[in-house]
C-alpha cells in the first residue's frame, strides 16, 4: 500500500469525498487522500509537475469527474496543468509536461474504489500558477497594472501584469511556501505543550479560528505569521516590484493569512475562492 496525503491532494486542487480513494494503477495500489498520512515527503519538496505524485492526483481527479457523470470511458480528455513560473519558463519544460500526461497517446487504465476507468488524454495546456487571478479579473485590469501572488504550500509565485501581459523581469517564484510557516507554528504549539493537532487544525490556528489554544500561545503564533508576511513583502520589494499596485492573492496561504496580508499590503484583494482560483482560470483557458 502506498500513501499520498490529503495535504498533497488539496494542493493539487482535487477534492475528495469523505475518506480516501483506493486506486490501482500500473500494478500498484495507492491510497490517496487519507487524513493525517504524509509519506513520500521527497515528492512534497518537488515543485515539478512531472512526478509520480502529481500524475496520480491528476489521474484520480479525472476518474472522479467520470464518476460524477456516470461514465467509465472517455477518449478525449483535455486538461490544464499549472506550474511554478520558474518551471514554466524553463526551455522544453512545457513540452515535457504535455508528453508526461499524454502518455504517448496510449489510454490510461485505472481502477478506483472498485470501478474501472479507461481514458485518453488528448490535450494538455500548461500555464503558470500566478496567472489565475488576473484571468478571473481580466475585465477590471485589461488596461491597468496589477500584481498577483500565489501563496502555495511549497512555493510562492508572483507576477506583474501590464494590460494583462506578464512583465517577465517582475515575475517568478520563491522556492518556499506556507508549509514552512505550518512547521514553525507546530513547533510553537509543541513548545507550549499543545500536541497531536492535525494539519487541518494547525491551519485553523494560523487563521485564528481554532478555539483550544491559550492567548499566550496565540500571541506567539500571530507573531510568526506577521513575520512570515513581512518577509514576503521584503522579498517582493527586493525583486523590484511596485507594491503600490493593486495585488490579487490566491492559494492556500491567502486563506490562512488573510488578516495579516490585509494589514501588511496597502491594496490587496483575496480571491473569492483562493484555493481554486488557478483551477477556475485553467477551465477558462481550455475554452
Where are the predicted features?
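Short loop/turn segments that connect beta-strands within beta-propeller blades
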Residues: 162-164
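Acidic, metal/cofactor-coordinating or nucleic-acid-engaging core segments within structured domains
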Residues: 189-192
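Short, structured loop/turn "capping" segments at alpha-beta junctions
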Residues: 195-196
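Nucleotide/phosphate-binding catalytic cleft detector across ATP-hydrolyzing
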Residues: 1-148, 166-178, 200-248, 252-287
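Short, catalytically relevant binding-site loops at active-site mouths
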Residues: 154-155, 175
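Active-site-proximal alpha-helical scaffolds that flank and shape metal-associated catalytic sites
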Residues: 149-153
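Short beta-strand scaffold segments in enzyme catalytic cores
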Residues: 1, 156-160
